[in-house]
C-alpha cells in the first residue's frame, strides 16, 4: 500500500455478531486507519465482544461501569525485556457489536458506516490519538473523516450523516 507500513490484524469473535462486517472489511479498515495515521508495523488484535465483556473492561480500566462502543489498549513492553525481544505488538481494540448496532440505529446511520467509524476510531486511539481536549479532537476527527472518506463513507460527525439512511457506495458488508 504505497510503501506505508501496515499492521497484521488478528480478529477474535468473542460474541455472536451476525450483522457485523466480515473479516476482510474489518482488516481493510484497520489497515486503512493505520495508513491515515502514517503507518505502523506490528500486530493489532480486533476483538468483537458482547456488552458484558466490554462493560467489565470499561469498569476495570476506565472506572465507567457501563458498556461502550470501542476500547483501545496499546501494548506496553514489560520492564526488563530488551528492545526487540518480542515481535512488534501494537495493541488490542475491543468493539461491542450490540452497542455499535444500537448507536447506528439511534443516530440513523448505516450500520456498516458506523462499524467502519468505530474501527477507525479504535485504531487511532491505539496509535496515541485522543479527543480529550478540543485541539486533539480536531486532529483525530480530521484523520477519521479523511480515512473514512477515502473508503467511501460519509463524515460521521456531519449532522446530515446522522439524518441519512443512504448506504455509501462500495460498502456492502458481504459483497
Swiss-Prot record:
UniProt keyword list: Cytoplasm, Endonuclease, Hydrolase, Metal-binding, Nuclease, Ribosome biogenesis, rRNA processing, Zinc
Cofactor(s) listed: Zn(2+)
PROSITE patterns in alphabetical order: UPF0054
Enzyme class: hydrolase
Residues that, per the record, bind Zn(2+): 121, 125, 131
Region annotation Disordered: where it falls in the sequence: 154-175
SUPFAM superfamilies, A to Z: Metalloproteases ('zincins'), catalytic domain
Enzyme Commission designation: 3.1.-.-
One Pfam entry name: YbeY
Residue ranges, compositional bias (Polar residues): 159-175
GO MF terms held by the record: metalloendopeptidase activity; RNA endonuclease activity; zinc ion binding
Cofactor binding mode and count: Binds 1 zinc ion.
Subcellular location: Cytoplasm
Role this protein plays: Single strand-specific metallo-endoribonuclease involved in late-stage 70S ribosome quality control and in maturation of the 3' terminus of the 16S rRNA.
Family as reported in the entry's similarity comment: Belongs to the endoribonuclease YbeY family.
Descriptive protein name: Endoribonuclease YbeY
The species this protein was found in: Alcanivorax borkumensis (strain ATCC 700651 / DSM 11573 / NCIMB 13689 / SK2)
